[in-house]
Every structure is written in C-alpha cells, then in structure tokens.
C-alpha cells in the first residue's frame, strides 16, 4: 500500500535545507574532519544551490522578525569555494531597539536548531553570529549609522556561477546601487524618536 506524499510547508523546506543537507567548510577530499562534521565539498551541491539555501535562511529570519522591517539585497561575493549573501535593513532601528532586533534573530535561530557562535554586546555595533549543522554561517550586525545587516556564508561547495538573488525586496530594490543608502524608512516600533 502506497502512502500519499505531502508537500512540506516553506519554512520546513528551509529548515531541511539549512540543517539536513550535509555541507561544511573546506577540508579533506573525503570530507571527514574526524569530529563527525562534514568538511569537504559535498557531491551535487554547487555554489548556486548553496547561495539559494543562504537566501532561504536570510528570508526566513527576516520573516521571523516582528514587526516587519524593510530590506534590500546587499552585494553577493564569492570566494574559492563559497558564497556570501547579504541583506541590508532599510528601516531605521533606534539604539534602544537594536538589542530587541538582535534578540529576535537569535531566538529564531535557536528555535530552528542553529548554534550561536558569538554575541557582541557592543553598545554601538552589536552583533549575533550563528552556524547551522551543515556549516552555513549567519549573522546580524549593526554598523555605520546604526544600519542592520544580515549575512549568510556558505560552507565550501563545488565551484559554479552564481546568479543574483531572486527574492524581491519588500521595498526599493536599489539595483546597481552601491553602496546602499542608509536606513530611511521609519517604523513606529523600530525607529522610536531617535534613530
């Protein structure tokens, strides 16, 4: 007797991709580091596929931050065997709300099985860094003028061309604009009186 297949909800797909697909940093040809974590280029996964998984992780954490913030794509960079995807938050986040913003990202990651690697409690430039079981590194950090940035670094994967992200920003796309403008969207919750 055959069982009917059910489609997974989008968040479940993101979690399976982020946590269940074995990937990790560059290592030996066999992919073993000796500590139970895969460390080589996994067969079948290339830079484009890993970049798409990074996009899904960034999209998921942004969806987990409530109330919503407006964001735009930052630059994509590639290295010998990996990719970094970025999102820039265009909503003004006041100094009083920055820790709340970081806490929401950190809580989302903890609930979804990410391991928190470091928390920077700097008053001006706080940040949270996490890693998935499959070797993706993700972070949220506040930088110049209090702008929040989200980044996802892939583990080492097979080299390939990498296309631009396909997710539509929830505000202006700022295509071919670098550097991106500073935060310019006000929020009753996130922006406060300062910002």
Regions found by a protein language model. Give the residues of each.
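Generic non-transmembrane alpha-helical segments
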Residues: 57-68, 104, 108
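Extracytosolic low-complexity repeat regions of secreted or lipid-anchored proteins
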Residues: 101-179
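C-terminal motif of bacterial Sec signal peptides marking the signal peptidase cleavage site
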Residues: 21-25
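Bacterial N-terminal signal peptides that target proteins for export
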Residues: 1-13
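Terminal, regulation- and interaction-focused segments at domain boundaries
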Residues: 34-48, 75-108
